[in-house]
Regions:
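Glycine-rich, charged/polar anion/phosphate-binding loops
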Residues: 128-129, 138-141, 170-172, 182
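Ligand-binding beta-strand-loop-alpha-helix segment within the catalytic cores
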Residues: 121-128
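Short, solvent-exposed secondary-structure boundary/capping segments
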Residues: 112-120
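Beta-strand scaffold of nucleotide-dependent catalytic cores
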Residues: 118, 143, 197-198
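Internal active-site segments that recognize and position negatively charged phosphoryl groups
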Residues: 134-161
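A glycine-rich beta-to-alpha transition motif near the start of alpha/beta enzyme domains, typified by
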Residues: 1-112, 152-198
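Short acidic-hydrophobic surface loop/beta-edge motif
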Residues: 4-6, 93-95, 130-137, 143-145
């Protein structure tokens, strides 16, 4: 199987061009390639596939093999891959996802994609404002937002001291989120600036 590993601000996936390749069991392949010590090491597997309703289709599998609906950083890499490898030949494209069709606007320089902007659609609030959750004996307030996939935004006083490798999975797999959730931890610096860790 030919693959490409790409990352968008550190969110790394293994990408397979399914215009040319076939992946028999993508859930299992995602688990194998995501293993950071014995596999390739990634946050998951993304398949770039033909689509009947868009320029291409993105299927995203998390490192545990579950299929996710969308990933903003992942879809930006899909756009770059699709253009740079000739799947598309225009700077504005549509990509089918489980979270709906997303529209990408790419800046091209020297025949290659330099930046990709994604129209994620209008975010939908998915919880009361704010909602409380308890993890590891700590009660935190969060705001639930859906941008094609679920996010929980937590406001904290100090993002630098957070052990994200420990607390991230605890929030992601919390019973409050039966379909898992992406967690963002935010410190408000002032009215115009935030500090965030994902």
């Amino acid at each position: 199987m030919k693959f490409t590993k790409m990352q968008g601000i550190g969110n790394d996936y293994v990408y397979v061009n399914c215009f040319e390749e076939h992946v028999e069991d993508p859930a299992r392949v995602a688990q194998l390639v995501s293993e950071r010590h014995f596999g390739i090491g990634s946050d998951g597997l993304i398949l770039i596939c033909p689509s009947e309703v868009a320029d291409c289709r993105m299927r995203m599998f998390n490192e545990d093999g579950s299929e996710g609906s969308m990933c903003g950083n992942g879809i930006r890499c899909v756009g770059k891959y699709a253009y740079d490898h000739g799947i598309v030949d225009k700077p504005q494209i549509s990509v089918e996802t489980l979270g709906g069709i997303k529209y990408l606007d790419m800046r091209i320089e020297g025949g290659k994609v330099k930046t990709v902007k994604v129209d994620m659609g209008i975010p939908q609030l998915t919880s009361e404002l704010p909602e409380k959750i308890q993890v590891d004996g700590k009660k935190l307030e969060f705001t639930g937002i859906d941008v094609g996939n679920p996010h929980a935004v937590y406001y904290v006083d100090d993002v630098d001291s957070l052990d994200l490798e420990k607390i991230g999975p605890a929030f992601e797999m919390h019973e409050r989120f039966p379909d898992r959730v992406n967690s963002e931890f935010i410190r408000v610096i002032d009215r115009r600036h935030l500090q965030m860790r994902v």
